[in-house]
């Protein structure tokens, strides 16, 4: 089984949401580790947002608070971490991991990028 997802977001949308809602918004979307690593970079936060959206698309589910209430996972159940060389990697928790198990997906690859006013993420899941 092979699943893919991609998402593109305007960095300013994330910057505005963080400015307006602060920690309340951050705690809903990013894990503590993600926030500590990226809180000073709207570009990095936006890229991780895009990765969460892309992963949800690959899993065939929505994210809580954005439609699909019957089959949604929480934002923090999809985590973007980094290996020792800084390469992004995907960690799933809770309902997101359960859905990956249902699909037979055991390995993930994630690519993040940003340029100008946009950030993009591409996610591939393999059985």
Curated annotation (Swiss-Prot):
Transmembrane segments: none
Cellular component GO terms held in the UniProt record: cytoplasm
GO MF assignments: holo-[acyl-carrier-protein] synthase activity; magnesium ion binding
Pfam family membership, one: ACPS
Biological function: Transfers the 4'-phosphopantetheine moiety from coenzyme A to a Ser of acyl-carrier-protein.
Family: Belongs to the P-Pant transferase superfamily. AcpS family.
Protein name: Holo-[acyl-carrier-protein] synthase
Organism: Herpetosiphon aurantiacus (strain ATCC 23779 / DSM 785 / 114-95)
Name of the encoding gene: acpS
């Amino acid at each position: 089984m092979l699943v893919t997802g991609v998402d593109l977001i305007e960095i300013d949308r994330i910057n505005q949401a963080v400015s307006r809602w602060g920690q309340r918004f951050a705690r809903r979307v990013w894990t503590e580790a993600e926030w500590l690593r990226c809180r000073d970079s709207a570009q990095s936060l936006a890229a991780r947002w895009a990765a969460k959206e892309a992963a949800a698309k690959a899993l065939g589910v929505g994210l809580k608070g954005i439609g699909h209430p019957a089959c949604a996972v929480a934002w923090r159940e999809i985590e973007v971490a980094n290996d020792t060389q800084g390469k992004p990697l995907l960690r799933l928790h809770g309902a997101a991991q359960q859905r990956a198990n249902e699909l037979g997906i055991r390995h993930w690859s994630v690519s993040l990028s940003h340029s100008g006013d946009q950030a993009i993420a591409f996610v591939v899941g393999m059985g």
